[in-house]
């Protein structure tokens, strides 16, 4: 009998694991770009495979969502946003509408606790309710000036079928005082489904927010609409920035009686017709292929993060980390007392070093990954001098007493073994320091090829990288070459790739020999001069 119980227990665990990501096997339909792949953003993705109701919200819900609007607004028209109308049944999210009396309705809503920002793909699988109410999956900025409507559907259309057969795919730009609203108009914003009401089946609704001036809309994996610069903000409500701010995700239903017919109290009381069902939501960001974007699966071997604000520029191929990025698959374990700044691009600062995360407190950055040995590169610096910055990994001190002058950016790296599926990086300040300040975290799995190559060149994995590493591009320069100081005239410089293959050989004609990087792909290389080797990172 005990064996039977154990078997049932393991079957239960297996089923729970299988259900953890209901979208497994469904490819992201948008193109992430050349050399890029999709990486799941777990802190805003959810299969809703848990039970949740008002007064009984598990961590699986509260870590990602709140059952209310971004502020105290209670909704448009006859809507009353109300927490009990947002619940889960163990496999789906229910966004319900119920009678509130006096012609009004209680309406379910959830808002993400974590923000997203372009480039990002977001998608839900959902079935809209059979009501005149709006069912919506959308995003909104804190200042309520930028809105993206991934989908807004009306399940029934009293007196006709026009709205029931069309899905609204749109966006808004606002001026709040005096209130001014722009959204694109015309048939292109209403996708027609061949005469079949959208309420009749589950559909996948997605949008690739590619950049501030490009939106791509997808339904059931097919691109159905593209919005470009001319339609984003023609009235210049946003001052030329486009849709550039970090934003919250919202899933809700609304009784939009300011322009739509009202649902009757009898209609609202019909539980067979008053629920907007959401099977899952998934969100992805494009990352460099070398970064091993996991598309929702395990196995990523490289993770590149550009630390800054919610709106500052991000280096191509990197993923944004701001002071509000909470640990899901990656992020800060505690965001309290972490600051962020964008110092701008003056004095030659590039998009890696112009923006920072900083704190006077000890804080942990965590990354989920497979077990193994990883090389971690961290870039320190700011426009102000910083002293005695320290980093520990997996409980072991790795970098100590890192100092940078004002405007100086220094990269240091180390290797660390991970055996619990999560890398923990601890950032702190020692005596005499005020804050730690970092611009980049780059985590790369150490392969047998790279380890063997280092050994062959007289280096070990424990050698201090600060004396043996170049970083390109230089924080203050963008020329397509790297300079090797103290070169011996008449000798040769040999550059190997990470597989140990020779990719370039240069005869030294100057004590500060310049090497052109034209044609070099992104990645890690090794420069050998007179038997001494150093890493060269091209990004």
Curated annotation (Swiss-Prot):
Q: Where in the cell is it found?
A: Secreted
Keywords (alphabetical) are: Glycosidase, Hydrolase, Secreted, Signal
Positions with a binding annotation for substrate: 73, 82-92, 96-98, 144, 176, 271
- Judged by the first EC level, this protein's enzyme class is hydrolase
**A single GO BP:** carbohydrate metabolic process
* Active-site residue numbers: 147 (nucleophile), 152 (proton donor)
PTM annotation: Proteolytically cleaved into mature beta-agarase A catalytic chain (AgaAc).
Q: Say if the entry is tagged with keyword Signal.
A: yes
Chain segments carrying region Disordered:
332-353
Induction (UniProt): When cells are grown with the low sulfated agar.
Q: Which residues form the signal peptide?
A: 1-19
Q: Which domain of life is it from?
A: Bacteria
Q: Which GO terms describe its cellular component?
A: extracellular region
Please state the Enzyme Commission number of this protein.
Answer: 3.2.1.81
Q: What family does this belong to?
A: Belongs to the glycosyl hydrolase 16 family.
Q: What does this protein do?
A: Cleaves the beta-1,4-linkages between beta-D-galactose and alpha-L-3,6-anhydro-galactose residues in agarose. Cleaves agarose in a random manner with retention of the anomeric-bond configuration, producing beta-anomers that give rise progressively to alpha-anomers when mutarotation takes place.
Assembly and interactions? Monomer.
Quote the protein name from its UniProt record.
Beta-agarase A
- Please tell me the species this chain comes from: Zobellia galactanivorans (strain DSM 12802 / CCUG 47099 / CIP 106680 / NCIMB 13871 / Dsij)
Traced from the root, the source organism's taxonomic lineage reads: Bacteria, Pseudomonadati, Bacteroidota, Flavobacteriia, Flavobacteriales
């Amino acid at each position: 009998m005990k064996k039977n119980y154990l078997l049932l227990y393991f079957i239960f665990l297996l089923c729970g694991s299988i259900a953890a990501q209901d979208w497994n096997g469904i490819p992201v339909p948008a193109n992430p770009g050349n050399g890029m792949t999709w990486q799941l953003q777990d802190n805003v993705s959810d299969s809703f495979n848990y039970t949740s109701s008002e007064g009984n919200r598990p961590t699986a819900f509260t870590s990602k969502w709140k059952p209310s609007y971004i502020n105290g607004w209670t909704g448009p028209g006859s809507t009353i946003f109300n927490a009990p109308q947002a619940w889960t049944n163990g496999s789906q999210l229910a966004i319900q509408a119920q009678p509130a009396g006096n012609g009004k309705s209680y309406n379910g809503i959830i808002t993400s606790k974590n923000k997203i920002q372009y480039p990002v793909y977001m998608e839900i699988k959902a079935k809209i309710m059979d009501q005149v109410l709006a069912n919506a999956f959308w995003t909104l900025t804190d200042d309520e000036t930028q809105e993206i409507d991934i989908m807004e559907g009306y399940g029934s259309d009293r007196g006709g079928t026009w709205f029931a057969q069309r899905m609204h795919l749109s966006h808004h730009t606002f001026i709040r005082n005096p209130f001014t609203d722009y959204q694109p108009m015309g048939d292109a914003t209403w996708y027609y489904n061949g005469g079949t009401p959208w309420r009749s089946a589950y559909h996948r609704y997605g949008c690739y927010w590619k950049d501030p001036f490009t939106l791509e809309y997808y339904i059931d994996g097919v691109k159905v609409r593209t919005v470009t610069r001319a339609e984003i903000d023609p009235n210049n409500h946003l001052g030329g920035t486009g849709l550039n701010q970090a934003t919250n995700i919202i899933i809700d239903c609304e009784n939009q009686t300011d322009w739509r017919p009202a649902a009757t109290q009898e209609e609202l009381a019909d539980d067979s017709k008053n629920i907007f069902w959401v099977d899952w939501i998934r969100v992805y960001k494009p990352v460099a292929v070398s970064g091993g974007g996991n598309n929702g699966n395990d196995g990523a071997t490289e993770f590149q993060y550009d630390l800054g604000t919610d709106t500052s520029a991000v280096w191509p191929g990197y993923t944004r980390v701001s002071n509000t990025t909470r640990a899901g698959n990656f992020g800060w374990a505690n965001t309290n007392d972490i600051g962020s700044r964008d110092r701008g691009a003056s004095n030659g600062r590039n998009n890696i070093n112009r923006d920072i995360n900083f704190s006077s407190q000890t804080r942990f950055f965590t990354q989920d990954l497979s077990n193994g040995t990883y090389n971690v590169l961290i870039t320190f610096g700011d426009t102000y001098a910083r002293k005695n910055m320290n980093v520990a990994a997996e409980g072991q001190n790795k970098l100590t007493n890192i100092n940078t002058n004002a405007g100086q950016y220094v990269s240091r790296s180390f290797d660390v073994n991970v055996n619990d599926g999560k890398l923990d990086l601890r950032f702190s300040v020692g005596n005499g320091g005020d804050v730690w300040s970092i611009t980049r975290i780059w985590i790369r799995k150490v392969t047998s090829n790279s380890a063997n190559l280092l050994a062959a060149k007289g280096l070990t994995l424990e050698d201090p990288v600060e004396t043996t590493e170049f970083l390109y591009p230089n924080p203050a320069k963008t020329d397509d070459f790297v300079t090797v100081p103290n070169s011996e005239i008449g000798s040769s410089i040999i550059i190997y790739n990470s597989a140990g293959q020779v990719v370039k050989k240069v005869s030294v004609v100057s004590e500060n020999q310049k090497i052109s990087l034209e044609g070099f792909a992104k990645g890690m290389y090794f420069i050998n001069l007179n038997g001494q080797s150093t890493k060269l990172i091209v990004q």
